Structure formats: structure tokens, C-alpha cells
Amino acid sequence: MKIGILALQGAFAEHAKVLDQLGVESVELRNLDDFQQDQSDLSGLILPGGESTTMGKLLRDQNMLLPIREAILSGLPVFGTCAGLILLAKEITSQKESHLGTMDMVVERNAYGRQLGSFYTEAECKGVGKIPMTFIRGPIISSVGEGVEILAIVNNQIVAAQEKNMLVSSFHPELTDDVRLHQYFINMCKEKS
């Protein structure tokens, strides 16, 4: 099994460490050539946290947006954390256009405010259990379509969800020692292969 990690910007190295802990091979995807070279071998894709506007621009500049979108729509399992969640959203409240736009949800960027407004908590995540959650200027999911399953709620806000082959979290599971949400994603990838 090999998981691709979008490595244009953001917390990609931390995701690679978690996958290594789980004994799963990962490959950093920095450009279209990387993606096309590894695409047939990929069991899944992680879109890490970072700055969603910058990541969206880089995806467009590298001509990666459409090939990744097509792969996701064709069933490639994808896990978007924080900015990665924003990339997957069909609608972003403060923007005119979405990025990948594959997941039926409306999101609000930087809902948890500035860096100083960031926080840590623990909450129940369906299918995983009670897990630690680190929020760093994270988005919230304002609403979801009928096909989207809500996995976690914190302070009456949706912070994790799944739609078919797409898993998202507003928080950063890669910044804790708890690997269960990544294991949940690995299990999704195994079911698809």
C-alpha cells in the first residue's frame, strides 16, 4: 500500500511520520509528474493542513487540480485535514469559487480565528472513538449534503465528516500521538483496493 501526500505546502511531513508509524509507505507529490508517475500505485491521497488559498493556487499552477479531482471522483480515497478539507469542499463561504469541489459540504475558512484562538480538545469521532483534536485556525463545516456522514461535532460545529471515498477533519490528527483517524483512513483505502 502506498499513500500519496500533497507536498506543495503545509503539514505534509507530519502525515508521512504517522503513516510510517503505521507501517504504510508514503510518497510526497510536489508536481504533476510526481502525481502521474505514482497515480496507478496510490491506494489513497492525503491533502494536509496549510494555507488553502496558497495550496489551491499551487495546484492550479502545477496543473494538478483537474487530474487530482478526476482521480477522487473516480474513487481514489482522500483524507483532507484543515486546509485539505477546504480544498475538497463544494462551497467556501468567503470565496466565489471552490478548489477541487468534490465533497458536498459548505465550509467557513479560519472559523477558529487567529493562531492565538487555536485550541486542543478531545471528542468522540464515529468509528474511531474519543480522540485528541488540535485546531489551528481551522475551518468549520457549516452544512453537508444528504450523502455526507457527520463523524465528529465540537461546540455544536461539524469538525469531521465522510462522503464515500472522502474523509475530512477541521483539526490536525497528525499533530497528536493518536494514529486512529489515520488508521480509519488506511482501512478506507484497503476497502477500495
From Swiss-Prot:
<keyword id="KW-0378">Hydrolase</keyword>
<feature type="active site" description="Nucleophile">
    <location>
        <position position="82"/>
    </location>
</feature>
<dbReference type="InterPro" id="IPR002161">
    <property type="entry name" value="PdxT/SNO"/>
</dbReference>
<feature type="binding site">
    <location>
        <position position="109"/>
    </location>
    <ligand>
        <name>L-glutamine</name>
    </ligand>
</feature>
<dbReference type="GO" id="GO:0042823">
    <property type="term" value="P:pyridoxal phosphate biosynthetic process"/>
</dbReference>
<dbReference type="GO" id="GO:0005829">
    <property type="term" value="C:cytosol"/>
</dbReference>
<comment type="similarity">
    <text>Belongs to the glutaminase PdxT/SNO family.</text>
</comment>
<dbReference type="GO" id="GO:0004359">
    <property type="term" value="F:glutaminase activity"/>
</dbReference>
<feature type="binding site">
    <location>
        <begin position="50"/>
        <end position="52"/>
    </location>
    <ligand>
        <name>L-glutamine</name>
    </ligand>
</feature>
<feature type="active site" description="Charge relay system">
    <location>
        <position position="174"/>
    </location>
</feature>
<feature type="active site" description="Charge relay system">
    <location>
        <position position="172"/>
    </location>
</feature>
<dbReference type="InterPro" id="IPR021196">
    <property type="entry name" value="PdxT/SNO_CS"/>
</dbReference>
<dbReference type="InterPro" id="IPR029062">
    <property type="entry name" value="Class_I_gatase-like"/>
</dbReference>
<dbReference type="GO" id="GO:0008614">
    <property type="term" value="P:pyridoxine metabolic process"/>
</dbReference>
<dbReference type="GO" id="GO:1903600">
    <property type="term" value="C:glutaminase complex"/>
</dbReference>
<dbReference type="GO" id="GO:0006543">
    <property type="term" value="P:glutamine catabolic process"/>
</dbReference>
<dbReference type="GO" id="GO:0036381">
    <property type="term" value="F:pyridoxal 5'-phosphate synthase (glutamine hydrolysing) activity"/>
</dbReference>
<comment type="function">
    <text>Catalyzes the hydrolysis of glutamine to glutamate and ammonia as part of the biosynthesis of pyridoxal 5'-phosphate. The resulting ammonia molecule is channeled to the active site of PdxS.</text>
</comment>
<keyword id="KW-0663">Pyridoxal phosphate</keyword>
<protein>
    <recommendedName>
        <fullName>Pyridoxal 5'-phosphate synthase subunit PdxT</fullName>
        <ecNumber>4.3.3.6</ecNumber>
        <ecNumber>3.5.1.2</ecNumber>
    </recommendedName>
</protein>
<comment type="pathway">
    <text>Cofactor biosynthesis; pyridoxal 5'-phosphate biosynthesis.</text>
</comment>
<feature type="binding site">
    <location>
        <begin position="136"/>
        <end position="137"/>
    </location>
    <ligand>
        <name>L-glutamine</name>
    </ligand>
</feature>
<keyword id="KW-0315">Glutamine amidotransferase</keyword>
<comment type="subunit">
    <text>In the presence of PdxS, forms a dodecamer of heterodimers. Only shows activity in the heterodimer.</text>
</comment>
<keyword id="KW-0456">Lyase</keyword>
<dbReference type="Pfam" id="PF01174">
    <property type="entry name" value="SNO"/>
</dbReference>
